[in-house]
């Protein structure tokens, strides 16, 4: 199945999108669903990250690659259509979905109640907790040490909210993406990066000196990554759920995991360490 990538949404803020993008049909016409639209179009438009190594990042050939990307491409293949990748950020992914610019979100988005008020979600396809990453020689060894310290992350990330609950005296600072937050820590502009553990592991693995950074502290919370879809479209959500569950049953999820996250990947994690098992229905 041919994969197409468009990069026209790079660096666009949520506010700017609302102004600059042409009007889009956020809801399918009466009597149709997103599944009907995707089938008719012949293309599945997936919102993916390009700043999360291992899940969605740009390789040396300029292609967006990663775990989430492979999941989205495999979903398209199982639906019998092509895939088109739209770069999104934590701040832009939900607005783009609501505006009808993309058909789904496959972009390290955690399913939790506040988000469920505005979009719907598939079954989970990955699980991760949230922690802090600091320089190895940092005096910060635990959440208690973050009092008065600066933690960087990306706008719209759940981790910053959880940090504020766990350590109210920590000072949060947001950046355009996780690489920018990581760079800020390297330059001493923030004292730590707070994010999903899998994201922190990817940033560390892709740095020139991975051993210079450590992931510390108790988990700030965690949850399933799931596919985000527009509300009230059960036919579309079911199609995605069944495809994800079939991937789990036939071994394709394992193949994608091993390629991007497993012991032979840059992240070098095992399924036991992740502790994830997909909800599969008979």
Question: Which residue stretches match the model-derived regions?
Answer:
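A ligand-binding cleft/hinge motif common to bilobed small-molecule-binding domains
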Residues: 92-95, 108-117, 162-165, 191-221
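Periplasmic-binding protein-like
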Residues: 126-134, 197, 201-241, 263-282
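Short helix-initiation/N-cap motifs at beta->coil->alpha
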Residues: 31, 85-95, 138, 157, ...
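Ligand-binding clefts/hinges and TM-proximal coupling segments of bilobed small-molecule sensing domains
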Residues: 27-28, 158-175, 212-213, 244-282
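Extended ligand-binding regions for polar small-molecule ligands
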Residues: 28-29, 70-78, 150, 157, ...
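Flexible hinge/capping segments at coil-to-helix
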Residues: 134-151
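N-terminal twin-arginine translocation
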Residues: 1-5, 14-26
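Extracytoplasmic small-molecule ligand-binding "clamshell" domains
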Residues: 28-108
